[in-house]
């Protein structure tokens, strides 16, 4: 079973994911070209890479889904989704936007996926984003 956590920025997705990983959920990491935030680690939160490498994965058709937000790429490796597809008895967890979640459901199969949308007030999200130095009025 794959649990996909989705929600707006600073809604608490990473906190929930980290707690479930402690309870034997296997994390499925997205690739991203953004810089790590304070406290984030390669291989624990994301697979951090550069645009050139990400674009080469796209050209080689190794990514199942990808998004670009500004100059930052996010994506999921087909090989990771194949592992989930062939091991439905294991518990996996990942964070995606709604569009990415829909793409992954199409690939893995709806019966193998549970999507949880985390809804938090904008005031709380702004406070959290300010704490992690990731708040600007333009983004909100």
Which residues are covered by each model-predicted region?
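Post-Walker A helix-loop "phosphate-sensing" segment adjacent to the P-loop in P-loop NTPases
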Residues: 22-30
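Conserved phosphate-donor/acceptor-positioning beta-strand/loop module used by diverse small-molecule
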Residues: 91-97, 109-130
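Hydrophobic anchor at the beta1->P-loop junction of P-loop NTPases
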Residues: 5
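ATP-dependent small-molecule kinase phosphotransfer cores
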Residues: 33-92, 98-99
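P-loop (Walker A) phosphate-binding loop of NTP-binding proteins
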Residues: 8
């Amino acid at each position: 079973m794959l649990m996909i956590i989705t929600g707006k920025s600073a809604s608490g997705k990473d906190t929930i994911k980290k707690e479930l990983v402690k309870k034997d959920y296997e994390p499925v990491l997205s690739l991203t070209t953004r810089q790590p935030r304070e406290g984030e680690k390669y291989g624990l939160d994301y697979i951090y890479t550069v645009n050139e490498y990400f674009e080469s994965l796209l050209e080689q058709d190794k990514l199942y889904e990808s998004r670009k937000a500004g100059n930052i790429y996010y994506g999921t490796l087909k090989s990771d989704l194949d592992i989930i597809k062939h091991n439905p008895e294991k518990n996996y967890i990942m964070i995606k936007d709604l569009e990415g979640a829909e793409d992954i459901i199409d690939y893995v199969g709806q019966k193998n996926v549970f999507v949880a949308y985390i809804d938090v007030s904008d005031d709380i999200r702004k406070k959290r984003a300010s704490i992690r130095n990731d708040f600007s009025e333009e983004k909100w």
